[in-house]
C-alpha cells in the first residue's frame, strides 16, 4: 500500500521533472539530487522516473498537438506558417534529426546507463553550461531560420548530431538541441520549438524501451504513487513549456548556464 510519504515524494519529483525536463538545465541532475535527499533511489525510483517522463511528454503533445498531427498528415485546420521562407516543417526533418541519437543510443545503451552516477552527471552539467554560453556568443547575428518552417533538412540533421551529446546523462537534451540549432543558424525561439517537437518521438522511444525493461519492478500498490507523479509532471511541464517559450523571447541562455554551474556545485557538495 502507498503511504502518504510516498505520495509526497511522488508529488515533489513530479514537480522537479515537469519543471526541468524541457528547460536546458538537465532534469537528470535535478532528479538525482532530489531523489537522494528524499531517500528515493534504486530500481523502483528509476522506473518511476521513466513513467513521470511520459507525463512531461504528454504536455508537449498538448501544446503542439496541431503541428504534431500535421506532421503525420492529419490536419485539424490550417497550421500558421512560422518563418520568412516558403518552406514547411515535415516529418522528414524530425526523422533526420532522430537518426544520429537513435543509432548511438541503441549501440551504446548499456554504456550510457553506466554513466548515471553523480560524478559523470556533474561534469555533464558543466559541459552543457559551456555549450549554452558558446551558443549565445558564437551564434550567427542574423539567423537564416527565423521560424520553425524555415529550418532546412541540413539544419535538422545537424541539430540531431548535437542531440547525441544528451546521451551523456546530465547534459540536457533540450540544452544540446537548442544550442545546436542556434549555432547552425536557427533563431532561439524556433530552435526551442523544434527541440520540443523532436522530444516527443525521441522520449517516447527511449522511455518505452526503459519501461519495457523495468516492468517487473512495478506492483499494483505503486499505482497511486506513479499516478500522482505522472499527473503532477504533466501539469507542471505544461506550465513550464509555455512560460519558457514566452521567456526566451526576452532573455538569453546565460542565466541557465550559470544555474547549471550552480547545480554542478551542489552535486559535488552532496555526493563527492
Curated annotation (Swiss-Prot):
GO CC annotation terms, alphabetical: plasma membrane
Cellular localisation: Cell inner membrane
Catalytic activity annotation: di-trans,octa-cis-undecaprenyl diphosphate + H2O = di-trans,octa-cis-undecaprenyl phosphate + phosphate + H(+)
EC number, as in UniProt: 3.6.1.27
Function description: Catalyzes the dephosphorylation of undecaprenyl diphosphate (UPP). Confers resistance to bacitracin.
UniProt similarity note: Belongs to the UppP family.
Name of the protein described by the UniProt record: Undecaprenyl-diphosphatase
Protein's gene: uppP
Amino acid at each position: 500500500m502507498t503511504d502518504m510519504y510516498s505520495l509526497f515524494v511522488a508529488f515533489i519529483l513530479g514537480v522537479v521533472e515537469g519543471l526541468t525536463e524541457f528547460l536546458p538545465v538537465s532534469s537528470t541532475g535535478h532528479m538525482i539530487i532530489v531523489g537522494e535527499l528524499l531517500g528515493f533511489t534504486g530500481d523502483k525510483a528509476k522506473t518511476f522516473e521513466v513513467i513521470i517522463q511520459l507525463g512531461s511528454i504528454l504536455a508537449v503533445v498538448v501544446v503542439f498537438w496541431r503541428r504534431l498531427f500535421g506532421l503525420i498528415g492529419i490536419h485539424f485546420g490550417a497550421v500558421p506558417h512560422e518563418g520568412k521562407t516558403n518552406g514547411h516543417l515535415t516529418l522528414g526533418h524530425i526523422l533526420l534529426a532522430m537518426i544520429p541519437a537513435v543509432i548511438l543510443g541503441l549501440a551504446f545503451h548499456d554504456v550510457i546507463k553506466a554513466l548515471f552516477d553523480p560524478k559523470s552527471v556533474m561534469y555533464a552539467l558543466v559541459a552543457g553550461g559551456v555549450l549554452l554560453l558558446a551558443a549565445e556568443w558564437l551564434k550567427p547575428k542574423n539567423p537564416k531560420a527565423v521560424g520553425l518552417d524555415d529550418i532546412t533538412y541540413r539544419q535538422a540533421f545537424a541539430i540531431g548530431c548535437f542531440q547525441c551529446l544528451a546521451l551523456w546523462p546530465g547534459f540536457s537534451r533540450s540544452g544540446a538541441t537548442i544550442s545546436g540549432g542556434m549555432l547552425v543558424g536557427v533563431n532561439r525561439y524556433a530552435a526551442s520549438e523544434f527541440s520540443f517537437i523532436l522530444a516527443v518521438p525521441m522520449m517516447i522511444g527511449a522511455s518505452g524501451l526503459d519501461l519495457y525493461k523495468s516492468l517487473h519492478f512495478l506492483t499494483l500498490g505503486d499505482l497511486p504513487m506513479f499516478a500522482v507523479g505522472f499527473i503532477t509532471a504533466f501539469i507542471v511541464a505544461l506550465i513550464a513549456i509555455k512560460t519558457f517559450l514566452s521567456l526566451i523571447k526576452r532573455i538569453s541562455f546565460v542565466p541557465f548556464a550559470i544555474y547549471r554551474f550552480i547545480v554542478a556545485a551542489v552535486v559535488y557538495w552532496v555526493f563527492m
